[in-house]
Amino acid sequence: DIKERTSYLQIILAIIIATGLALILLKFQAWRLWKLWFFLSVFFTLLIAFNAFMDQIFALLLALVIASVKTFKNNVFVHNFSELFIYGGLAVIFVPVVNVVSIIVILFLISIYDYIAVWKTKHMVRLAKFQARIKLFAGLLIPYGNKSAILGGGDLGFPLLFSGVLFKTY
């Protein structure tokens, strides 16, 4: 049973564990395991999101098709379309178990983690390069010319969680 006032502890612990697993996959260049983890994450978050507004079997089939195309075909339109729903699925999971104080603590701790991960240990940069190389990442892909930019999943997900908690509370 997760208490709203201390839910940030479990969420931060889960982020630390997931980061550790991601770094292990990176170290061993385990792209097949990364692909499986990515597929399952996309599938389940899409399933949760779609289940909110369609019959369960249709939600299951649509989540399966989109997760498969996103993971195995590298289509920018499917990738970005799925991202719009993935964060809604994450919000359905996390908003009910987080209160305003917890989400503020999470945002504060994530900001510190992000700074350390990008500027000090640089493991976030290594993870981003690994994900870009195998073309499996969380976030929006914005192509321009012969290049592309990425808006990371955390830049979408955390503000959505914050907004969801505020809507739930007030």
Language-model segments: residues:
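A membrane-topology feature that recognizes alpha-helical transmembrane segments
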Residues: 1-170
